[in-house]
């Protein structure tokens, strides 16, 4: 999938799940299941409940996403 096809939106981590999965509440009120992107995993960036994050969503499945950035 091309990089231009993704939808980027900010949200807040609500819950943590096994296998580096998180429930993220988006700005518009929807909740999505998000995984951690490879660069965040590689650099050992910790994501905790309450963190503000940027999530990439595919236009084909708006219920799952990828966390690409954690705000400080």
Curated annotation (Swiss-Prot):
Main location: cytoplasm
PROSITE patterns: S1_IF1_TYPE (PS50832)
Entry-linked SMART domains: S1 (SM00316)
Keyword entries, A-Z: Cytoplasm, Initiation factor, Protein biosynthesis, RNA-binding, rRNA-binding
Places the protein is found: Cytoplasm
Pfam families xrefs: eIF-1a
Lineage: superkingdom: Bacteria
All residue ranges annotated as the S1-like domain in the record: 1-72
CDD domains: S1_IF1
One GO CC term on file: cytosol
GO molecular function, one term: translation initiation factor activity
Function recorded in the entry: One of the essential components for the initiation of protein synthesis. Stabilizes the binding of IF-2 and IF-3 on the 30S subunit to which N-formylmethionyl-tRNA(fMet) subsequently binds. Helps modulate mRNA selection, yielding the 30S pre-initiation complex (PIC). Upon addition of the 50S ribosomal subunit IF-1, IF-2 and IF-3 are released leaving the mature 70S translation initiation complex.
Assembly and interaction partners: Component of the 30S ribosomal translation pre-initiation complex which assembles on the 30S ribosome in the order IF-2 and IF-3, IF-1 and N-formylmethionyl-tRNA(fMet); mRNA recruitment can occur at any time during PIC assembly.
PANTHER family: TRANSLATION INITIATION FACTOR IF-1, CHLOROPLASTIC
NCBIfam families according to UniProt: infA
Family affiliation: Belongs to the IF-1 family.
Descriptive protein name: Translation initiation factor IF-1
Organism annotation: Streptococcus suis (strain 05ZYH33)
Source lineage: Bacteria, Bacillati, Bacillota, Bacilli, Lactobacillales
């Amino acid at each position: 999938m091309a990089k231009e096809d993704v939808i980027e939106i900010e949200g807040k981590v609500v819950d943590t799940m096994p296998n580096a999965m998180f429930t993220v509440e988006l700005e518009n009120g929807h909740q999505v299941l998000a995984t951690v992107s490879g660069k965040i995993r590689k650099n050992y960036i910790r994501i905790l409940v309450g963190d503000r994050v940027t999530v990439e969503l595919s236009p084909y499945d708006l219920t799952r996403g990828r966390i690409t950035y954690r705000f400080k």
